[in-house]
Amino acid sequence: MLDRIRVVLVNTSHPGNIGGAARAMKNMGLSQLVLVQPESFPHGDAVARASGATDILDAARVVDTLEEALSGCSVVLGTSARDRRIPWPLLDPRECATTCLEHLEANGEVALVFGREYAGLTNEELQRCQFHVHIPSDPEFGSLNLAAAVQVLTYEVRMAWLAAQGKPTKMEKFESTSMLNTELVTADELELYYAHLERTLIDIGFLDPEKPRHLMSRLRRLYGRSAISKLEMNILRGILTETQKVARGLSYKRSDD
């Protein structure tokens, strides 16, 4: 199960931190490491800091974009230490672990995303995350080393996984009582939906592309905190398609007859 959690490091500048993150992952039973445009990898410092977790480094995927790194994920959790203009669902590490387990029990793929050592994740990158995770360190000295942050979250995930052995999760209970298809949408499917939604809002005159303000960011937050199933996504996409037909004066399926 833990092999469906990917640790995503974005634009890491120090290769030693990649090695330290790999060691933290292997300590806690995780194996998927994805690197988005690392400044220097592979590198001897990464191997040295991995301290025996070189199999994690050897299997690491290097990609050009965060979108590639998140492809196929049903939930994306991004670490953030800064206040943002638009509030977002914020979890502590323990809540993050619980959320991970619920999606794993639903056969989803999970991504834990960590930003640059000097600046973290950008606002645009954080908007690709359904949840933001904050490690409540001492505010007088709150900056954590990247590998240490990976260790904190992967430890909590492992503890939640151990505690859940033999016990039904909230997601399992939901599945046992629901008639709906509960296979969750992936991060890339959500991105396609957001693009479709934006085009539709422009078509009906609700969104001015010249003055978008924060509308799409707020809508991302709204949908991001919901566990949307593939069936529900099909319904939402169908509604948008029919709305676009009406806006463009085309024939559409529904009628009042």
UniProtKB/Swiss-Prot annotation:
What is seen without this gene? Inactivation of the gene abolishes Cm, Um and Am formation in tRNA. Mutant has increased sensitivity to hydrogen peroxide (H(2)O(2)), with reduced expression of oxyR-recG, katB-ankB, and katE.
Q: What is this protein called?
A: tRNA (cytidine/uridine/adenosine-2'-O-)-methyltransferase TrmJ
Keyword Methyltransferase assigned to the entry: answer is yes
User: NCBIfam families of this UniProt entry?
Assistant: PRK15114.1, rRNA_methyl_1
A Gene Ontology molecular-function term? tRNA (cytidine(32)/uridine(32)-2'-O)-methyltransferase activity
Q: What does this protein do?
A: Catalyzes the formation of 2'O-methylated cytidine (Cm32), 2'O-methylated uridine (Um32) or 2'O-methylated adenosine (Am32) at position 32 in tRNA. Confers resistance to oxidative stress.
* GO terms for biological process, alphabetical: tRNA nucleoside ribose methylation
SUPFAM superfamilies to which the protein is assigned, alphabetical:
alpha/beta knot
* Catalysed reactions listed for this entry: cytidine(32) in tRNA + S-adenosyl-L-methionine = 2'-O-methylcytidine(32) in tRNA + S-adenosyl-L-homocysteine + H(+); uridine(32) in tRNA + S-adenosyl-L-methionine = 2'-O-methyluridine(32) in tRNA + S-adenosyl-L-homocysteine + H(+); adenosine(32) in tRNA + S-adenosyl-L-methionine = 2'-O-methyladenosine(32) in tRNA + S-adenosyl-L-homocysteine + H(+)
Species this protein is from: Pseudomonas aeruginosa (strain UCBPP-PA14)
Mind naming one GO cellular-component term on file for this protein?
Answer: cytosol
Q: Which residues bind S-adenosyl-L-methionine?
A: 79-82, 115-117, 135, 142-144
